[in-house]
């Protein structure tokens, strides 16, 4: 009876080890994915005709991609180093300085988003807890390449009868890189699952440094990616 009890446990352990690369294997993992990012505390305010309006940041989606090298230290432990591109930032709801019930000329702001382009270098330790299933933690350095806030600005008139006449929207792009720190540090924590050579990864970057120089806001970012593992050295 004990033999039959321990046999499934032994089989699970063997599968957990065999799902990973052999000790001493160096693997190359190109990957693509999507970010869900935000910039905490980065409210935007517009003051037009003595009427101030503001908007709070919300999560937005962005592209993520790059590659990682992973070295299998032990049957259930690995170490990886990567270079990733990450489009982060935040978005805002559409706002205007219109006063309810009052006719006049106003300004509207739509499609507003902050785009921060980073190159990131994550160093991660992987602990395999099941067949192909790993928990990851480490340190990540980020370097800001470009930062812009973009939106469409539209003048419109509210008539006394409540009718609205819109003008032609025109795009606005503001360079915000000088107001941000060019270096960023974070602690990535995540989980990955490998099936065959396909690696699915989800992680969150806990910020260690401030994103902006004066406000003290921080980057908040979830990353979901899919990659393919090539064993290049055994």
Residue ranges and their predicted role:
Residues 1-31, 226-232:
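Bacterial Sec-dependent N-terminal signal peptides
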Residues 35-39, 86-90, 142-146, 205-209, ...:
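Structural signature of outer-membrane beta-barrel domains
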Residues 20-70, 231:
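Short glycine/proline- and aromatic-enriched beta-strand/turn motifs that initiate or cap beta-hairpins
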Residues 170-234:
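Predominantly the C-terminal beta-signal and adjacent terminal strand-loop region
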Residues 23, 74-76, 130, 195-198, ...:
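Outer-membrane beta-barrel channels and translocator barrels
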Residues 38-60, 87-117, 144-184, 188, ...:
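Extracellular/periplasm-exposed beta-strand and loop segments of Gram-negative cell-envelope proteins
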């Amino acid at each position: 009876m004990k033999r039959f009890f321990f046999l499934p446990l032994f089989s699970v352990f063997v599968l957990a080890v065999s799902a990973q690369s052999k000790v001493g294997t160096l693997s190359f993992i190109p990957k693509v994915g999507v970010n869900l990012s935000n910039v905490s505390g980065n409210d935007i305010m517009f003051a037009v005709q003595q009427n101030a309006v503001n908007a709070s940041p919300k999560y937005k989606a962005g592209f993520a991609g790059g590659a990682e090298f992973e070295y299998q230290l032990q049957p259930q432990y690995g170490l990886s180093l990567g270079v990733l591109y990450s489009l982060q930032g935040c978005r805002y709801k559409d706002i205007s300085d219109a006063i309810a019930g009052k006719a006049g000329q106003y300004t509207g702001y739509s499609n507003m988003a902050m785009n921060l382009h980073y190159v990131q270098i994550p160093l991660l330790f992987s602990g395999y807890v099941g067949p192909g299933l790993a928990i990851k933690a480490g340190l990540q350095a980020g370097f800001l390449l470009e930062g812009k806030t973009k939106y469409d600005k539209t003048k419109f008139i509210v008539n006394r009868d409540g009718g609205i006449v819109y003008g032609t929207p025109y795009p606005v792009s503001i360079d915000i890189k000088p107001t941000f720190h060019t270096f960023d540090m974070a602690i990535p924590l995540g989980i990955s699952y490998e099936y065959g050579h396909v690696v699915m990864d989800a992680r969150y970057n806990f910020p260690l440094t401030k994103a902006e120089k004066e406000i003290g806001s921080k980057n908040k970012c979830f990353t979901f990616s899919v990659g393919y593992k090539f064993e290049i050295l055994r």
